[in-house]
Amino acid sequence: LQYSIDTRLKVENSASVEVDAKTAKMIGCDPGDAWHRIESVRYLDEKSPICWSDVYVRPEHQNIADRIGEDTTPVFMVIEKEFGVVAEEVTMDLFAGSIEESKAWVMGVKPGSPTLIIVRKYKDKTGRVFEVSVSEHPAGRFTFSIDLLRSSNSD
């Protein structure tokens, strides 16, 4: 449930924010809560953007923003290495959306184009969310496959 090691995040902006009501609902917190938002684009290579990602981390982890994109290490693993916070549970939601104008030009699509939005919430052993990533994939740039295997009882 993570991206290939062949992809890389490029940080576009990083800032401490108080989340608005819409963002709070999406990431599962209260409006006005303090988070550090890392706005980034995930690339397959230097020319092919796969998705726009807004990564929200707790304020005490904000200094990891400088480490994002140095290599292909996922953000939650950077937090684990730097702070010892281990992801014990990850919740993932997928839903359809449409891309905002501010992100469309970076992704090379028209504003309002359809997207697949994936929200991942990373929780520590106490159940506290320490990272939320909101990834927005323009149509045709992400495939999610699940294989289900039915076993028969031969009793």
Which residues make up each language-model segment?
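C-terminal all-alpha effector/ligand-binding and dimerization domain
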Residues: 6-155
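Short linear motifs at protein or domain termini
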Residues: 1-4
